[in-house]
Amino acid sequence: MSIKSRIRTIPHYPREGIMFRDITTLLKDPVGLRITIDEIAERYRAEKIDKVVGIESRGFIFAAPVAYALGAGFVPIRKQGKLPAETISCDYQLEYGYDKIEIHADAIDKDDRVLMIDDLIATGGTMEAAIKLVQEMGGKIIECCFVIDLPGVGGSTRLRQQDHPLYSLCSFDD
């Protein structure tokens, strides 16, 4: 059984016309979860990753165990106001307005080899902002990894056009 087949699709959620990709069915399946983490970790095992960055909130689910498997540190990127120490931030565009993400100012060291992980790429706006934060701190991004790509929304194309390497475990074209 593939990773993709373990992800539930919920039509018209959270609003009409949206096909929501629900990872909870993947997460509750111990084999599916293990396969997902192992596949990501194996891809980067030889890359000498220093830090694995997880994007709030579902990116944390995958990034922390991958960091553990690689012997790397885990770094959360969170929405504004959620991190307790000094932060740096970046605005990014939403469908209707803007939001802000933050990272602790001491989370990434210059020349750290960084793997970025999120559960899904749609527009690419959140990951684009996260990339800016890591690069501003002097981190070297090895790749941006997603469990799910929604290529029809355009985020993966957008990041590739900016020369950001990315990888996804599965994609949904509809």
From Swiss-Prot:
Keywords: Cytoplasm, Glycosyltransferase, Purine salvage, Transferase
Pathway(s) this gene product operates in, as recorded in its UniProt entry: Purine metabolism; AMP biosynthesis via salvage pathway; AMP from adenine: step 1/1
Protein's UniProt keywords contain Glycosyltransferase: yes
PROSITE patterns documented for this protein: PUR_PYR_PR_TRANSFER
Reactions the enzyme catalyzes: AMP + diphosphate = 5-phospho-alpha-D-ribose 1-diphosphate + adenine
Subcellular location: Cytoplasm
Primary location recorded for the protein, binned into one broad class: cytoplasm
EC number(s) recorded for this UniProt protein: 2.4.2.7
GO cellular component, one term: cytoplasm
InterPro entries: Ade_phspho_trans (IPR005764), Adenine_PRTase (IPR050120), PRibTrfase_dom (IPR000836), PRTase-like (IPR029057)
Gene3D superfamilies, per the entry: 3.40.50.2020
Pfam families reported for this sequence: Pribosyltran (PF00156)
GO terms classed as biological process: adenine salvage; AMP salvage; purine ribonucleoside salvage
MF term (GO), any: adenine phosphoribosyltransferase activity
Subunit record text: Homodimer.
Described purpose of this protein according to its UniProt entry: Catalyzes a salvage reaction resulting in the formation of AMP, that is energically less costly than de novo synthesis.
Family named by the database record: Belongs to the purine/pyrimidine phosphoribosyltransferase family.
HAMAP family assigned to the protein according to its UniProt record, in alphabetical order: Aden_phosphoribosyltr
NCBIfam families: apt, PRK02304.1-3, PRK02304.1-5
Protein name according to UniProt: Adenine phosphoribosyltransferase
Native source species: Nitrosomonas eutropha (strain DSM 101675 / C91 / Nm57)
